[in-house]
């Protein structure tokens, strides 16, 4: 045998690999023990206690047993490519520990553990490192990762003897590959997926990411949520939601003056004067507050990130809990909600629908999701003459406002229009070089807020000149990840305004009192104020 046999196992009075079944079982059990111990570190101790399920030891035993098949499948995968039990154990433990470490890092950064839909964002994390604050994923990261994965694997392959039977080797290799890969493949087969998803749903119950991370550990929780996501009957969910909303197209919206609705989703916008920052000047925001028929603080779908969750809540009018496991990344299954979201309803009622977002069209799969949700036209980053080295990291709100006004001018006077604008200007990171000589992240954020306020004035003044009713909805998608100011924000609710402009303005208007609102109610509230919301939708 190799050097490992002669020296590495010299203290053992027998050769472990002469007992392949016992060694393999022992390595699997060792993996389970290490994984059970390390899974707890996916969340800080305080969060773990806070989200621990309130039930007894019997249920806890069931949760532990439920993790064993997941660990076994990962172990089988490493074993299938090597037929080396020690390597399979090391690979399995490393695999789970890496997932736990990623989950802990994500929670530290954005206060949410790893969720199954994050796997769909892996390519985006490496493609858009700045927007994910992942600039450290550079060449050094790849060298270290490569050396660890392939270097350690090579050492095991060289020093650890294989236990692959001498006879019928190809047969046993294929059998093991089938055992390792077969169950994963069967998850996509309806007759297997549906009962499996139902069983997992009974086990998991509520889709509570933090609680399920405590119960099952990071990777098992990700797998269980993915199985539920694959098997959930969205047609039934959508049918129930449609019945609740009574969203009949013929009862929808009509108006003789061809109104225009502009929804401006302002990236990371929150009025810092709520937190005692009196140095900032936001005259346009103050103006909107006085002119609004409704304004106040907007609850968070997610604090500090995941813009698409707030975005979908506003566009759909759906409470995140109502869309079950899709809530974490609704655009993955956008087609299922096409008939009940606002853009689709408006388009079918004869409105022109336009989505404007000065960022890569493939990000969050918007290039696929938005047409499915009812937007007939998309204006994305490739439509802007933007050079980061010349214009800054993101397209400014001033440039975006000018583009919105230009697109609005193209809308025929006799046609109603719905424009959803998602800005990018104040997305982090707030690093030196973004605003003059400023170096402090808070100062940079405040300066961009003031720039955004000036751009809003440009937009509002332009919209007020139109000869049609205009309804303007403005809101911040989430609080900024401004850790040097607060982590987390003491009150993460953002600001919103529903403002009538141009011919929609009343002759006499008195300022309104602030009203708290939820993102999924925002467009419904606007339509009621505009008298564009029929009884059938209430």
From Swiss-Prot:
Record's subcellular location: Cell membrane
Membrane topology: Multi-pass membrane protein
GO cellular component, one term: plasma membrane
Species per Swiss-Prot/TrEMBL record: Rhizobium meliloti (strain 1021)
Gene Ontology BP terms: capsule polysaccharide biosynthetic process
Gene name of this polypeptide: rkpI
Pathway the protein takes part in: Capsule biogenesis; capsule polysaccharide biosynthesis
Alphabetical list of InterPro entries matching this protein: Alkaline_phosphatase_core_sf, OpgB/LTA_synthase_biosynth, Sulfatase_N
Residue stretches spanning the membrane: 16-36, 70-90, 114-134, 139-159, 170-190, 212-232
Keyword list, A-Z: Capsule biogenesis/degradation, Cell membrane, Membrane, Transmembrane, Transmembrane helix
Function, in words: Involved in antigen K (capsular polysaccharide) biosynthesis.
Main location class: membrane
Transmembrane helix recorded as keyword: yes
Pfam families attached to this UniProt entry: Sulfatase
Protein name: Capsular polysaccharide biosynthesis protein RkpI
